[in-house]
Amino acid sequence: VEWDERLKGFKINIPHGELFYSKHFFNKKNSDKSIEYFLENNSNNWQTTDWKNLTVEEFKSICFKNIKWKHDSINLYGKNSLLPRITSWYGDPGKSYSYSGINSNPNEWNKELIDIKERIEEVANVKFNSVLMNWYRDGEDYLNWHTDDEKELGVNPIIGSVNFGATRDFVLRKNDKSLKITIPLNHGTLLIMKGELQHYWQHSVPKRKKVKDMRINLTFRVINN
């Protein structure tokens, strides 16, 4: 582990991978503004609405001003199930993305996302062309074990992940389950994954039933298609 004074974060070398971690990469004021921007809509108070209890139809009827949120279903064992989170995909024209049988065509960038992207690019030293947004409505929403190894991401992808809202654990484990690393991601935290990490490690955001607040995570990527 090595502190980088210029980038204000830790460079962390792990077997077959590299991480960069900056706990307060975005300050509280900017992070608060971002989450409000992402959830601003013309009908519901984003802070007091019980988002978990809305039906799919009720959710679809809400007109979000800045982000085109969607609640996808996936087919598991022949049965359709709603994803345990809300998502949105933004990117350059033609930068579509497929995962878990879900195909996403890119929404057009807006100023807020571009501003966040450019800040992270300064640290990651790469030009991102897309971002997956995951909205965890509370601690019951989660992300299963997986690896970001889709062919359109390239051989050794660099992925920049920024967290707004509730603190949630980001957990890495080696494919052979011999080693596990838990990293709490706070309001405004940046985590960058690079090197061979996606070949040797899986990651997840497990359920945390005590967490009642929402969290919005943005993972910036480079799509090669």
What are these regions (language model features)?
Residues 1-225:
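Non-heme Fe(II) oxygenase metal-center motifs and adjacent flexible, charged/small-residue loops
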